[in-house]
């Protein structure tokens, strides 16, 4: 079996970096990926793909990328489920990223507060 995904798109918001109780960095990002064709109105639509990044990949992406950054993500599709507060099973499909390539001409560091 083969499960590999390669995407190029722009971050829809700043990476959401957190740490697990074991100290592992994890970040969640959403990529806006343009479709390769135009709709009936002549506009290019985008798909919004949720991605999860771990460890150094998560930390580096949070450090060097922000909303609007152009990135390339390679990884695999993963599905999982959990029970929400109302007791309803929620199913999630996301990309578990192996690598993230920063594709802007120059990485943009976040401004110090």
Swiss-Prot record:
Chain coiled-coil ranges: none
GO cellular component: cytoplasm; nucleoid
Keyword field contains Cytoplasm: yes
Residue span, SSB domain: 1-104
Main location: cytoplasm
Keywords: Competence, Cytoplasm, DNA recombination, DNA-binding, Phosphoprotein
GO aspect biological process, one term: DNA recombination
Gene disruption phenotype: Transformation efficiency drops 10- to 50-fold. Destabilization of DprA.
GO molecular function: enzyme activator activity; single-stranded DNA binding
Phosphotyrosine: residues bearing it: 82
Inducing or repressing factors: Only expressed during growth in minimal medium, strongly induced when cells enter stationary phase with highest levels reached about 2 hours after transition to stationary phase. Expression activated by ComK.
Compartments (UniProt record): Cytoplasm
Function text: Not essential for replication of the chromosome, but is required for optimal competence. Binds ssDNA, binding is facilitated by DprA, acts as an accessory factor for homologous DNA strand exchange.
Subunit text: Homotetramer.
UniProt xrefs under NCBIfam families: ssb (TIGR00621)
Name the UniProt record assigns to this protein: Single-stranded DNA-binding protein B
Originating gene: ssbB
């Amino acid at each position: 079996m083969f499960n590999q995904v390669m995407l190029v798109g722009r971050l829809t918001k700043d990476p959401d970096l957190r740490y697990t109780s074991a100290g592992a960095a994890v970040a969640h990002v959403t990529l806006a990926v343009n479709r390769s064709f135009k709709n009936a109105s002549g506009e290019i639509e985008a798909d919004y793909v949720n991605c999860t990044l771990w460890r150094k990949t998560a930390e580096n992406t949070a450090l060097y990328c922000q909303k609007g950054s152009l990135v390339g993500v390679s990884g695999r599709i993963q599905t999982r489920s959990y029970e929400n507060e109302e007791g309803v099973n929620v199913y999630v499909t996301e990309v578990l990223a192996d690598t993230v390539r920063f594709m802007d001409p120059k990485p943009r560091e976040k401004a110090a507060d």
